[in-house]
Amino acid sequence: MSFIVLVNGYRCAKNTDDTLGAVFSDTAIKRIFGNNININSPENYANQTIPAYINADNGRVIDDKKATLGRVLFYDKALSTNGNIACASCHQQEFGFSDTAVQSKGVNGLTGRHSMRLINARFAREAKFFWNERAATLEAQTTQPIQDHAEMGYSGLDGDPDINDLLAKLNALDYYQELSAWAYNQSDSKKTLSENNLQECLGAFIRSIQSFDSKYDEGRRQLANNQNNAPLPNFSSDENAGLQLFSAPPIFDNLGSRIAGGLGCGGCHRAPEFDIDPNTRNNGFVGSIDNPTVLDLGNTRSPSIRDLVNPRGHLNGPLMHTGSITSLETLIGHYNRILVRPGNNQIDPRLTPGGFPQQLNVTPTERQQFISFLETLTGKAIYTEAKWSNPFAL
């Protein structure tokens, strides 16, 4: 059972457990995870505080038990054929659940695109996942890397084992026998994990990874819920100027050159979620990661642009599906003067005003103001919070 409560401007999803009093074995859980997992007092994933001004939510109701099981799955290298790669290998907590490598290393080679950050994956208007939106939901996405030959190896093709081989391996492990019985309320310990269970639990854990304790959020909480682009009382003058540059649309001349207004970033990455507009087309980055001369036009999904940098001010890994942007200055440079490759007939029209590639004419002062604003979107807890950390680390 579940219900929603609204308290002091925040909303929380409250879950009740219909099986209170049931007793579950945790001998293997204690042996493997020590004090990192306590089934008698699981971490709070379901009832986290969500600011009342956050509206976009593509998620399902999160269950603490299933998210706990999802945390184990996320960090377990047993999900790869050689036992060396976990989901967390490419989505590292210290880097905002991103990867500092341009291409992540899998069991049989490198990934075909840069690994996306997973922060606030739930809080987006776009429900599809992957850069090219090939997964209809986050849950559908979670087992595709497992079944990729290069990434985790359970493809079932050309001699690879398949997902059923993985399930047999996991169901033979005593800690999964205990965790799955507990998560699915089957005290007889006869619960076996299915692919749907993996998707549900991994999805619950990833959906729980949220970041709403940034400087931006501290100021945003002081305004009315619909004041997404208003100056924030805790911001410096440069940060507020950067916010306005981000939010305000540019005014172009008849050749696509900006003569007034802002930079228009909020047209595709709307505050306060800073997610991607579901109707966005590509942003001009259309090269393939392995061969920049080969066009890869369909990459229209983006993670939230919250936590682009970590609390130390360092970029949380390279940006774009090619991983070719390695600084915020380079990011601004790309949008400052859009280059439309021959054959790119799917570029977002917001980047080609009047049919001309945009020229934003960003000044050095505007560049620094814009970067100052982007740095206010960095949270704190996600980088160190134990409930999102590696439970195998004793």
Label each residue range with its predicted role.
Residues 14-144, 217-336, 341-344, 386-394:
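Short glycine/threonine-rich turn/loop motifs
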Residues 121, 128-172:
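Glycine/proline-centered hinge or cleavage motifs at structural transition points of membrane proteins
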Residues 10-12:
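N-terminal Sec signal peptide cleavage junction
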Residues 163-182, 186-188, 192-212, 321-394:
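C-terminal capping alpha-helices of c-type cytochrome domains
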Residues 1-5:
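Bacterial N-terminal signal peptides
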